[in-house]
């Protein structure tokens, strides 16, 4: 039995902190809280009306996938991870993650609601898990892992792949629109959400490092390569990024690059050994630790939650 899954009678009380690294990650998440009301999407409609039919088609399908996927992540947290993991610090993080995923889902739903005026098309997009085969394939893969009998460690990797790999190409495609100066509301929300998801992915890697009996490298590689092939198909066959003027082969390479970064963070050898083909993604917050706190991505951070001078905080307070 993994110590972090062992029954813990002290799980209802936060102090004293036992796992400082996990608690620090929770405080990082707390510091980066935001709400949809802070994102101005009023200027997006002008840009939306100038987009080509292909560009609109692409964005609508990406948003449809995103709108459903956060709910799947939350179902896994509610039904499995929050129940299985017994250490309070991780439960704090998972609880906060659920709130953030709700905000992401609300944001994507609001974007669809704003851009798409036809009510039938709206319903089609909101029900993408049933109506769109390309979205259904990704959703089915993620949902399969919620109910799988695999170990916590294996399912941890699967959901790190969902948040780290299944989202990566879509994030990059929206940042591509930012590079072109389009859709400021969509691209700003994408910046906030990609930063959050990067942090969630980093948290999965941290939890993995706390496992005494982690899955084998072979198992990890199998889960990650499976996710890579599904994501590559999504963005180069089902919903090709060439619709918005991106290069499909470069997108395939980018997804491999992201997968390598994830598996390295888990402590294993890279699978693909490729370089990042998208220069505009070099400084983007897809790694949760990519210095949101140093760069203050989107110039937003919850005031006073973490010191601006440094991110280290101590609990050695004299009570």
Curated annotation (Swiss-Prot):
A single BP term in Gene Ontology: deoxyribonucleotide biosynthetic process
Location of the region described as Interaction with R1 in the Swiss-Prot/TrEMBL record: 313-319
Co-factor requirement: Fe cation
Keywords per UniProt: Deoxyribonucleotide synthesis, Early protein, Iron, Metal-binding, Oxidoreductase
Residue ranges of the TM segments: none
Active site: 108
Induction: Expressed early in the viral replicative cycle.
PROSITE patterns reported in the protein's UniProt record: RIBORED_SMALL
EC number: 1.17.4.1
The keyword Oxidoreductase appears for this protein: yes
Keyword Secreted assigned: no
GO MF terms, alphabetically ordered: metal ion binding; ribonucleoside-diphosphate reductase activity, thioredoxin disulfide as acceptor
Residues binding Fe cation 1, per UniProt: 70, 101, 104
Cited function: Ribonucleoside-diphosphate reductase holoenzyme provides the precursors necessary for viral DNA synthesis. Allows virus growth in non-dividing cells. Catalyzes the biosynthesis of deoxyribonucleotides from the corresponding ribonucleotides.
Family: Belongs to the ribonucleoside diphosphate reductase small chain family.
Protein's recorded name: Ribonucleoside-diphosphate reductase small chain
UniProt organism field: Variola virus
Protein's gene: OPG048
């Amino acid at each position: 039995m993994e110590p972090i899954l062992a029954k813990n009678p002290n799980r209802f009380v936060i102090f004293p902190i036992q796992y400082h690294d996990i608690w620090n990650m929770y405080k990082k998440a707390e510091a980066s809280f935001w709400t949809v009301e802070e994102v101005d999407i009023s200027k997006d409609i002008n840009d939306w009306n100038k987009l080509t039919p292909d560009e609109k088609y692409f964005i609508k399908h990406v948003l449809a996938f995103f709108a459903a996927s956060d709910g799947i992540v939350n179902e896994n947290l509610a039904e499995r991870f929050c129940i299985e993991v017994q250490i309070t610090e991780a439960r704090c993080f998972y609880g906060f993650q659920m709130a953030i995923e709700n905000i992401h889902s609300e944001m994507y739903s609001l974007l669809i609601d704003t851009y798409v005026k036809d009510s039938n098309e709206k319903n089609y997009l909101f029900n993408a898990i049933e109506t769109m085969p390309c979205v259904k394939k990704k959703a089915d893969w993620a949902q399969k892992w919620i109910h799988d009998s695999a170990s916590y460690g294996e399912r941890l990797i699967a959901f790190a792949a969902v948040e780290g790999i299944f989202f990566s190409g879509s994030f990059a495609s929206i940042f591509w629109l930012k590079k072109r100066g389009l859709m400021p509301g969509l691209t700003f929300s994408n910046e906030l959400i990609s930063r959050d998801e990067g942090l969630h992915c980093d948290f999965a890697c941290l939890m993995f490092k706390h496992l005494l009996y982690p899955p084998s490298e072979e198992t990890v590689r199998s889960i990650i390569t499976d996710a890579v092939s599904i994501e590559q198909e999504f963005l180069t066959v089902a919903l090709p990024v060439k619709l918005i003027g991106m290069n499909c082969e470069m997108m395939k390479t980018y997804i491999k690059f992201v997968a390598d970064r994830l598996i390295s963070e888990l402590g294993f050898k890279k699978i693909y050994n490729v370089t990042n083909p998208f220069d505009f993604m070099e400084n983007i917050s897809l790694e949760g630790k990519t210095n949101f706190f140093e760069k203050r991505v989107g110039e937003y951070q919850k005031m006073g939650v973490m010191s601006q001078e440094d991110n280290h905080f101590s609990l050695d307070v004299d009570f």
